[in-house]
Curated annotation (Swiss-Prot):
HAMAP family: GreA_GreB (MF_00105). NCBIfam families: greA, PRK00226.1-2, PRK00226.1-4, PRK00226.1-5. One of its GO terms (biological process) is DNA-templated transcription elongation. It comes from the Bacteria. This is Transcription elongation factor GreA. Necessary for efficient RNA polymerase transcription elongation past template-encoded arresting sites. The arresting sites in DNA have the property of trapping a certain fraction of elongating RNA polymerases that pass through, resulting in locked ternary complexes. Cleavage of the nascent transcript by cleavage factors such as GreA or GreB allows the resumption of elongation from the new 3'terminus. GreA releases sequences of 2 to 3 nucleotides.
Amino acid sequence: MTSIPISVQGYKALEEELARLKSERPEIIQAIKEAREEGDLRENAGYDAARERQGMAEARIKYIESRMALYQVIDLDTLSGDKVIFGATVDLEDVDSGEAKTYTILGPDEADPSKGSISFLSPVGQALLGREEGDEVSVEIPRGRVTYEIIGVSFKGSKNLG
């Protein structure tokens, strides 16, 4: 069984989501019961919506619970070094356009590119792992092949997260 790194903050967020989803179960069951009492289930939008909500919640609960056993929780405040690893913040420059980007390398269940974090499993994340300042990486992304120069590698810890 392969472990999946996750930050302390990411793990806590998933624990909170799991608790919230479990606490919503009685409310969802009540909504299904009330919709069922309205009669014909074939044309009962309230019933269909409540069942769909239940299915989505149960699927997410099952997913989170199955992942919890695989996580290796890492305290980002204890990391340091010169190489890109899980938890590193990497400053990049697109060699062709000069565009600057900064990413923190996190796990797949906590990465959010819109907030500046990417998964170590993403194409860019995989290309960066093990590299250091001054290295160039070339990676295939949806808009085509791009080459980045690593301008800096730092470890800002948990204060750098959302």
